[in-house]
Amino acid sequence: MVQFAIARDFQGMPFYFNVTTPVGRGYPNAAPEDVALVQFIFVVGTRGQHALDPALLPTWSKVTVTSRSDDATLAAINAWQAFRRQKFGGSVDTDGIISVVRTESGMYGPGKGMSYDIVHLNFVLLFATKSIWPRIDKDSRCPPVLAAAVRKALSGHLAP
């Protein structure tokens, strides 16, 4: 089940979609909605108007939204984490897992910390679906399982 989470200190993004189960290596039975969210971000990220780093395109473009962890999804997660580590340094986890955010700040680590992968991926989602965000359920590529989870997460927060 995808969760609605308030974003603190993330300029331009008032909230984000959080996963409720870890997605990636070692989690073959992650919640289908959570896997679909991560896969959907990879799919729309390759076709969004915001320029995705070219190093990510070959791996991300192989992902399809199946709602199940598969080799293409795991490879895309690994590529994303390697990209973030190269860009932001050794404080970025490269464990092959999109973790559940369990902090109010959306950050982990000492000091100012580092944003969780899912928070950073939500920026990709925001830019790639800017004309409809946060109603990503209205995107034709959004599978029914994710669309239902998004509507449930947003109910009570937004007008239809």
Residue ranges with predicted function:
Residues 1-160:
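Cell-envelope/ECM-targeting effectors and their regulatory/trafficking segments
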